[in-house]
Amino acid sequence: MPQRIVFYFIAFVVLASLVYYGFSRWQDSRLKVDLWTLVPETAAFVVETNNHSELREHLEETALWESFSLLPVTQRFQENMAMLDSVAPGNQRLDRFLDKKNILTSIHVLGKTDVEFVYYIPVVSVGEHRFLRTLTENIVKSPAFTEQSREYQGMLLTDVTNTQLGTSFTYFSYHNNIILSASPVLVEEIVRRINRGKLTSIAADYKKVNYLSQADVYANVFVNYRALPDLLGLFVQEDLMPQVRYLSSFCRNAMLELKLDRNKLFLNGFSNPETLEGSFQAQLHPSKPRPLEIKLLLPTRTAMLMHFG
C-alpha cells in the first residue's frame, strides 16, 4: 500500500510538472510583443506598413523605385524572396503571408559602408504557423539552400544560405514573431536587447500616433536624426559631413506619414527638437528678450527698420 501511494504521488508530481510546463509555454506563445521595442537604437529609419503588396506595387511605378532597386541590398532581397517563393508550399505564396499585417522594417548602417535591413513579421494564426513550418521543411529539402541552427544567449538562431546566389539571412522566432535580417550582427544585437529586459520603444514619443488608420496612408515612417548622418554619409562627400551632422541635430526624431500619388512621394508629421548641448536646435533656443532702445532715437518719419541683434 505505501509503495502504491508513493507511485501515485510521483505520477501526480510528474503530471503536474508537465501541465505547468505546457501552460507556461502556451502562455509565453500568447504573449503579445510590441515590435517597436525590439528595434535597436541604431536604426536610422523604421517603416511600418499594413499593406505590403499595395505599397510595393505603387512604389514600382515610381522613379524612386528605379533608383532604390539599384542598391545591392535591394537586389539581394529581391533575389532571396524569389528563391524563397519558389519553395513556398502550395499556392500560399510569400506575398499572401506578408500581406494585411503590420510589418516593421528597420534600416541600419554597418561599418560606415553598408546598409542593412531588419524585418519584424508577426505570425497571427495557426495557418501561418503551418505555412512557416512547411516552408522551413522545404528549405531544408531544396538543393538551393543550406540551413544551420545555433544557440545565441538562449535564443535559437537559424542561418539560411542561398548556395546559388551566395547570399544568406538569419532569423529567429520570438513570441509569435519572426525577426529576420541578412546581417547576423543585427539579429544578435536584437537578442542581446531582449535579454537585457525592460524593453522600450524607439518611438515611445509617438505611442499614440498611427497614420495607418487614415485613408491613402501607406506607412508610418520613424526618423532617428541621431543615426541619420551615418546613412547620408553613404551618399555625401566627407568634407560636407560636419554640416550634415550639424543640420541633423535640429531634431531628435520624427514620425511621418507616407503617401504616394503617382510619381510623387509625400511625408508629413511631427518632429521632436534635439535637446543635446551644442546641437543646432540648442543654438536656436530663444534667449531672454531685451528692449530695443534704438526706437527712442528713430525719427517719426521712419517707414521701416531692419534690426539684426
PLM features: what roles do these ranges have?
Residues N162, T167-G233:
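A conserved glycine-rich beta-strand in the N-terminal activation segment of trypsin-fold
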